[in-house]
């Protein structure tokens, strides 16, 4: 499949056109940002790991009936994905209180929530991705009521699945961000899961030590990000357990194939 012109560049990914008008290529960058782009860096190998981890999670979600934009991983940094119209909302799912919510509401960090909490933020870097209510979404036609109801049902299933998946490898799923888009097929729009699911978009803590295995390592200067992301990939079975990876050699990873 031929890669065409660049259609869009965000903080962590670039979208390219292809020879198929219904498909695009998603390229994972090594750029790391935090605090609405106020803190920036380039971390060699981050894009490779996020590509592999997101492919693994989205593929597993497909198996349980969660339709998403992933078609296949093209190479170490790129995926072929379905072209969707992104709904301009970030859906934040919280299982444990940490980060901005603790400051906003004066809640003790690490408080386990009685049930998953869903928050909405408008995707707008210039405005700082402000927190909004469901009424805002409906009032400004960012999504319809039926679209929101479908998204909420998908989110509950995704959360249940991911909690179990990570728990099985000794990781607590603290919170995560999801994005959804409208897929146009046969003249109709269908809302599906889009973007990525990776340590860039999730907070992941070791189940025993509470060690941060996500982008908070960059946000809070807790140490190198690559070993933490590599640890997540190893635990999920994406990489050989014996692999000792660094930011230098991570880009040379090859696909792990099951032995017959």
Curated annotation (Swiss-Prot):
Known catalytic reactions: 5-amino-1-(5-phospho-D-ribosyl)imidazole-4-carboxylate + L-aspartate + ATP = (2S)-2-[5-amino-1-(5-phospho-beta-D-ribosyl)imidazole-4-carboxamido]succinate + ADP + phosphate + 2 H(+)
GO biological process: 'de novo' IMP biosynthetic process; cobalamin biosynthetic process
Keyword Heme attached: no
EC code(s) of this entry: 6.3.2.6
Superkingdom, natural source: Bacteria
GO cellular component, one term: cytosol
PROSITE patterns: SAICAR_SYNTHETASE_1, SAICAR_SYNTHETASE_2
InterPro entries: SAICAR_synt/ADE2_N, SAICAR_synt_PurC, SAICAR_synth, SAICAR_synthetase, SAICAR_synthetase_CS
Listed pathway(s): Purine metabolism; IMP biosynthesis via de novo pathway; 5-amino-1-(5-phospho-D-ribosyl)imidazole-4-carboxamide from 5-amino-1-(5-phospho-D-ribosyl)imidazole-4-carboxylate: step 1/2
Keyword Nucleotide-binding: yes
Entry's Gene Ontology molecular function annotations: ATP binding; phosphoribosylaminoimidazolesuccinocarboxamide synthase activity
Keywords linked to the UniProt accession: ATP-binding, Ligase, Nucleotide-binding, Purine biosynthesis
UniProt-listed PANTHER family: MULTIFUNCTIONAL PROTEIN ADE2, SI:DKEY-6E2.2
Cross-referenced HAMAP family: SAICAR_synth
Family: Belongs to the SAICAR synthetase family.
Protein name: Phosphoribosylaminoimidazole-succinocarboxamide synthase
Native source organism of the sequence: Pelagibacter ubique (strain HTCC1062)
Record lineage: Bacteria, Pseudomonadati, Pseudomonadota, Alphaproteobacteria, Candidatus Pelagibacterales
